[in-house]
From Swiss-Prot:
PANTHER family: S-ADENOSYLMETHIONINE:TRNA RIBOSYLTRANSFERASE-ISOMERASE. Monomer. GO terms for molecular function: S-adenosylmethionine:tRNA ribosyltransferase-isomerase activity. GO terms for biological process: queuosine biosynthetic process; tRNA wobble guanine modification. Belongs to the QueA family. It comes from Thermotoga petrophila (strain ATCC BAA-488 / DSM 13995 / JCM 10881 / RKU-1). This is S-adenosylmethionine:tRNA ribosyltransferase-isomerase. Pathway: tRNA modification; tRNA-queuosine biosynthesis.
Amino acid sequence: MKVSEFDYELPSELIAQEPVEPRDASRLMVLHRKTQRIEHRIFREIIEYLEPGDLLVLNVSKVIPARLYARKKTGASIEILLIERLEEGIWKCLVRPGQKVKKGTELVIDEDLSAVCLGRGEDGTRILKFQPQDDRLIFEKGRTPLPPYIKNEVPLERYQTVYAKEEGSVAAPTAGLHFTPELIEKLKKKGVQFAEVVLHVGIGTFRPVKVEEVEKHKMHEEFYQVTKETIKKLRETRERGNRIVAVGTTTVRTLETIARLPEQEEYVGKTDLFIYPPFEFKLVDALITNFHLPRSTLLMLVAAFAGKDFVMEAYREAVKRRYRFFSFGDAMLIL
């Protein structure tokens, strides 16, 4: 399958530069897979589509302030993006410009914080040891790691879901940005159940698909965790005959990863599961997601879930109706 089949025309003014206030006032496109019908609603009206006993599964990973600005002793500016914590104060990072950072290169963030390059990781990353080795201090100095298509500085809390609690992502699981505490409360009152997973969104989010053939693309590994409590809720939902509703593509990848493993009480590991058409979904019955970049692995996942032709038609409709796209954009519910 060609990557070009997942391309579409998007006017740049439809790329949302800041989030909507309140969060649940964003638009919601509803896709009905059985009837191929499309509806246009507001996100807070999602409550009308969820039944008592349905299980909403949230990714509670929290975005870290992963972007840092440093200087070499020569005065050259270096941008650092924290990718993965190896141990306290030692991180796998992306650095720009990369050719200027070699083993032994010292980087100064400010008078309180510096780093030294211990060497190269795979895939062009660098291993940086910070001085002092204090993650709290590193986070204090860091900024929100916004995607390159967002030009405004946005406070970290607005690039964070209201339920985020497990630090580790370098990009937000954006489908969850539309939920407010009030909406969650209303859903609970209706009898909708909630469960949590963790998938720390990694650098794959920033990396474009560079191959021509979809099947040749390789995903980066990302850390995930599913607790006993969540496993129990998934099982009970299945037994009741209710739906498992994934909030976001990261939740889908976590659930479909464990669905392919031997049964365990709880799961923790790394996944590089790449979902593209055709794909047999074993756990996810419905999906809440944003509008994704052309040719992206996220769009391929959505196409696998709802059918490529239907999804590409929905995207053309979204452009025509001037929906807002990407991280701070509008949402889609696929039933």
